[in-house]
C-alpha cells in the first residue's frame, strides 16, 4: 500500500515517444502518487468544510439562523478555491494530467486485461471531460452574499463533490491497474480538527 503522507517524491517527468510497459507503469505510479497528494488535500478540505457546516454551524442556532457576512465569505471562499484547484487538476495540458495518463493507458492493452474494459475506460474519460467542461464553462466566482448561501452554492458544491469523488476513484483504480497495489486516499487527522472551535475566540472584556 502506498501512503501519500510519506516524504515528498523528487523526480522529473519526461514523456518519451513510447515506453515499454514497465517504464510506463513506473512513470504512471509516480504521477498518480503526485496527483493523489493534490486530490487528498482537496478531499481533506472538503471534509473539514462539511464538518464545519454539520457539527459547528448547524448544531448552533446562533450560527445557523444568522446571515453572518463572515460565514458567507467562508462558504464562497471554499467553493471558489475548490473550483480553481479542480480546474487545474482537470486541465489536459497540465504538467500532471490524469486525463492524459488515462488516454495513454489505452496504448498498453495488456494492462487492462481482466481489470478494465475499453468501454469502462472510455466512460471514465467521458466523465472527466464532462466535469472539466462544467468547471470551465459553468462555474463563476461568487461575490455577493445572496450568491454565497448554502442553497445558492448547493448545485455547484454537488458538482465539485462529483469531481473530487471521480478523481479519487480514478486514481485508486488506475494505480491498481499499473501497480497491482493500493493507494491510500482516505482523509485522516492527527488530532481533532474541530478543537479550534471548542474555546472562545474572543475573550470577554
Regions found by a protein language model. Name each.
Residues 2-131, 157-205:
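Amphipathic alpha-helical interface segments
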Residues 125-153:
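Histidine-centered, metal-coordinating catalytic motifs and their short helical/loop contexts
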